[in-house]
């Protein structure tokens, strides 16, 4: 494939050090650490200690202490002499600074929203005071606590009537208020667990008023959440999927955080260009199969080539063995023997398949295939959607050199870099789909159609998820798009859309596959095609950097240190 990918600025002279895959006593210290690491370790420990001590969700006391520690470490980081840091340490500085600023912003948002919801939790300070004295085991005034709990119950009943008259509460405020009520409920539960049965007067006075207050707090939290209204309110369009579109401004904010210098509209344009390439290649494969330009008929034929029930694990292992042998033969990457030895298999439950209709991976390879108690049509859709030709594109995505190798490497190289981003996680796994296509891994037209199906799917993910979040498409339109434009089985398309919008994933998660993959492919063109490293050196080095935005991996690979006040500017795609 000819990728329309460039980097938009001239390369600087770079001295790139290729590290050995496994550490040895002679290995440079920077293989595992940097000057910024020391601060990061201290921050993580301090933040954790405070979070575990001040446990009440959204409480002012907790927020004040966390704001204090974040600001303290922002100032500590500024005291480092940035100019004297090496490139890897500068990358750590830039990303850690970004994370601290984001943490600060999140806490400030929490404070702003909390001030707007205090009318719904007028009893909060009473509970905070009860919880605070419990921390050091003060002798409780059982009768006083019982009186306070009784008053809280009365207050909640009054608030429930007030809430019933509300037409709605902005989703962010409803979510914050509900979480705060649940936090207060947990605080009371901790007090009750600590004293009840141990302190005689507490045990005599408190149980009945506590149980009433506890029950009402749970009901009240749910009632508040039920009143949430979105800026872009969603009704059930028949799909049963009701998510929360975040809007263009939030998407752009997220893209800046992930160091992606493109707008949502530009990313959709990238997806459409990649889709057009897939269309051309799909027609070629369809003709080679004897179906002419009727690529959907060719796709249907490929779907019928599923393996019988009970044989999917064996078929997947065969594909895994082929992909690992191919990567070795072409000297694309080093695999530690332990990484090959210790990945595991399991079968996905029918319930999990509603959200993940295809297999998932990592150290545990979870196989999606029908069980005996599934409906007949669901069985066939699962088998058709997980046929070996489709899976040829994704077994290496989930195992080696994809997610399983990522998990293996992340626990062994620069483990302090917990800069998790789907553009690294999913981008790397998708990159291997692109690379193995270019290297000739698909053997037959059926293999090509299977791999193209998944590449079209990655393009479609960008298009449907961004159109949904900017308010253009409904979930049902997204499902129909996957069925009509990509050729998905309808049940699989529904599962994919459900997973995207109500599965707890970041709004940019589905975008990250193809965009992250294209970023890495662009870097490969600079580093490998440019003669700076071999494939094996490039891929081994990439894994040793651990998770971070791809632009920062590139800075390390090319020894091009980022500026202290960094702003993403690395354009990697030519329109």
Region locations from a protein language model:
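N-terminal maturation segment of proteins
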Residues: 21-575
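Bacterial Sec-dependent N-terminal signal peptides
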Residues: 1-27
């Amino acid at each position: 494939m000819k990728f329309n990918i460039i980097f938009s600025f001239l390369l600087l002279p770079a001295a790139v050090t290729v590290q050995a895959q496994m550490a040895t006593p002679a290995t440079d210290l920077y293989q595992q650490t940097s000057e910024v690491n020391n601060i990061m370790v201290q921050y993580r420990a301090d933040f954790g200690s405070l979070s575990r001590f001040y446990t009440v969700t959204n409480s002012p006391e907790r927020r004040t202490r966390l704001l204090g520690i974040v600001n303290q470490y922002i100032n500590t980081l500024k005291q480092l002499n940035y100019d004297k840091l090496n490139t890897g340490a500068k990358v750590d500085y830039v990303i850690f600074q970004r994370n601290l600023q984001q943490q600060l912003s999140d806490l400030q948002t929490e404070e702003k929203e909390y001030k707007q919801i205090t009318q719904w939790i007028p009893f909060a300070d009473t509970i905070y005071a009860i919880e605070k004295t419990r921390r050091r085991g003060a002798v409780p005034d059982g009768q006083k606590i019982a009186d306070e709990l009784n008053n809280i119950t009365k207050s909640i009943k009054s608030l429930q009537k007030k809430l019933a008259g509300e037409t709605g509460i902005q989703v962010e405020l409803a979510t914050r208020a509900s979480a705060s009520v649940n936090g207060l409920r947990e605080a009371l539960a901790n007090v009750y667990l600590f004293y009840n049965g141990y302190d005689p007067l507490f045990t005599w006075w408190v149980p009945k008023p506590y149980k009433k207050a506890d029950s009402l707090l749970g009901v009240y939290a749910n009632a508040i959440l039920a009143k949430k209204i979105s800026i872009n309110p969603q009704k059930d369009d028949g799909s049963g999927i009701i998510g929360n579109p975040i809007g263009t401004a939030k998407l752009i904010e997220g893209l800046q955080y992930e160091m992606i210098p493109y707008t949502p509209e530009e990313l959709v344009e990238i997806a459409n260009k990649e889709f057009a390439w897939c269309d051309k290649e799909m027609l070629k494969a369809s003709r080679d199969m004897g179906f002419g330009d009727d690529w959907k008929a060719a796709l249907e034929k490929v779907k019928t080539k599923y393996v019988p029930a009970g044989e999917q694990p064996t078929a997947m292992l065969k594909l895994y063995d082929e992909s690992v042998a191919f990567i070795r033969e072409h000297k694309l990457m080093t695999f530690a023997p332990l990484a090959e030895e210790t990945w595991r298999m399991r079968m996905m439950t029918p319930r999990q398949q509603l959200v993940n209709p295809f297999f998932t991976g990592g150290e545990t390879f979870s196989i999606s295939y029908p069980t005996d108690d599934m409906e007949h049509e669901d069985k066939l859709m699962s088998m058709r959607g997980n046929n070996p030709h489709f899976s040829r594109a994704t077994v290496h995505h989930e195992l080696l050199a994809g997610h399983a190798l990522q998990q293996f490497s992340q626990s062994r190289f620069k483990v302090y870099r917990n800069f998790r981003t789907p553009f690294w996680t999913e981008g790397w796994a998708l990159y291997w789909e692109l690379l193995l296509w270019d290297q000739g891994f698909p053997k037959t037209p059926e293999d090509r159609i299977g791999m193209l199906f998944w590449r079209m799917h990655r393009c479609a993910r960008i298009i449907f998820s961004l159109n949904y979040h900017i308010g253009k498409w409904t979930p049902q339109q997204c499902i129909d798009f996957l069925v009509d434009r990509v050729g998905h089985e309808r049940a699989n398309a529904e599962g994919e859309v459900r997973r995207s919008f109500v599965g707890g994933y970041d709004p940019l998660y589905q975008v990250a596959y193809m965009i992250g993959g294209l970023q890495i492919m662009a870097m490969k063109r600079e580093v490998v095609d440019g003669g700076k490293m071999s494939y094996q050196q490039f891929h081994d080095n990439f894994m040793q950097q651990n998770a971070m935005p791809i632009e920062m991996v590139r800075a390390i690979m090319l020894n091009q240190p980022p500026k202290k006040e960094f702003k993403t500017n690395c354009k990697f795609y030519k329109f």
